[in-house]
UniProtKB/Swiss-Prot annotation:
Membrane-spanning intervals of the chain: 100-122, 142-164, 174-192, 228-250, 265-287
Modification type N-acetylmethionine: residues: M1
Protein family membership: Belongs to the sideroflexin family.
Name listed for the protein in its UniProt record: Sideroflexin-2
Organism for this UniProt entry: Homo sapiens (Human)
Transcription is among the record's keywords: no
GO molecular function annotation: monoatomic ion transmembrane transporter activity; transmembrane transporter activity
InterPro entries xref list: Mtc
Reaction(s) catalysed by this chain's protein: L-serine(in) = L-serine(out)
Length: 322
């Protein structure tokens, strides 16, 4: 039996995005790491199906389940602002496989300076690509800005890790294991604002409820970027804080001392166990489509909105990025 799709809106959220649980379910769906292995052909099919559904011309015999699956693939692989296919490594669905490997090795190889520098560099290279891929595409980023952001974040991460390693030499071993997290958190506070500095300088695009562009707001940009920084730190925090405690205890066991070669793979696997939950939880902390009271915007932009809408538009909306 053919499904009636006349009233189906493919862009309507399946879960209430005003609630934390609804957002977590949404991101659990689109950050599914299995979508990383979907073929280019299937991704292109998903984009065609989504675009046809928006125009109301889906092929006969199409089922709702097919459209929902197409939307899942589309959201996982295509940028929400431009509709362009994102590079695989930069997608949020790659956070689990990519993040678990890097996190596991950062936590394992934290004792020697060359290893600390190398893995912090690898992590910041990965973060820079993720930040660029998931930026608000309405605010263009130059090659110079990307290079400066990458250099600054990498320098910050390495300097933090090296400095704290030196300061914690006489501290309990567990404290030294937490150094990678401190470096990651510090770098996130630098990398994301630097990568998106144009939004802080010129403002982020804000729209009305009907997706009509109103103007650009620096205050909205500051809020969106702050939320992204908090989300990224939250994503890595549980694994990078609790895993050192777990490994500190496990490594004292007799059988673990005999299989030191398995310590790194074990940390990678355990990092994955944390990230499989923390990626959607961290992404869902704040709505991706942010709502901001007009009264919080810059006075000049407030005047523009009041002149155009009167008091009928109490809020503006913008994509904060991921």
């Amino acid at each position: 039996m053919e499904a009636d799709l006349s009233g189906f809106n493919i862009d309507a959220p399946r879960w209430d995005q005003r609630t934390f649980l609804g957002r977590v379910k949404h991101f659990l769906n689109i950050t599914d790491p299995r979508t990383v292995f979907v073929s280019e052909r299937e991704l292109d099919w998903a984009k065609v199906m989504v675009e046809k559904s928006r125009m109301g011309v889906v092929p006969p015999g199409t089922q709702v389940e097919q459209l929902l699956y197409a939307k899942k693939l589309y959201d996982s692989a295509f940028h929400p602002d431009t509709g362009e296919k994102m590079n695989v490594i930069g997608r949020m669905s790659f956070q689990l496989p990519g993040g678990m490997i890097i996190t596991g090795f950062m936590l394992q190889f934290y004792r020697t300076m060359p290893a600390v520098i190398f893995w912090q560099w690898v992590n910041q290279s990965f973060n820079a690509l993720v930040n660029y891929t998931n930026r608000n595409a309405a605010s263009p980023t130059s090659v110079r800005q990307m290079a400066l952001s990458y250099f600054t974040a990498t320098t910050t991460a390495v300097a933090t890790a090296v400095g704290m390693n030196m300061l914690t030499k006489k501290a309990p071993p567990l404290v030294g294991r937490w150094v990678p997290f401190a470096a990651v958190a510090a770098a996130n506070c630098v990398n994301i604002p630097m990568m998106r500095q144009q939004e802080l300088i010129k403002g982020i695009c804000v729209k009305d409820r009907n997706e009509n562009e109103i103007g650009h707001s620096r205050r909205a940009a500051a809020i969106g970027i702050t939320q992204v920084v908090i989300s990224r730190i939250t994503m890595s925090a549980p694994g990078m804080i609790l895993l050192p405690v777990i490994m500190e205890r496990l490594e004292k066991l007799h059988f673990m001392q005999k299989v030191k070669v398995l310590h790194a793979p074990l940390q990678v696997m355990l990092s994955g166990c944390f990230l499989i939950f923390m990626v959607p939880v961290a992404c869902g902390l704040f709505p991706q489509k942010c709502e901001l009271p007009v009264s919080y915007l810059e006075p000049k932009l407030q005047d523009t909105i009041k002149a155009k809408y009167g008091e009928l538009e109490p809020y503006v909306y913008f994509n904060k990025g991921l």
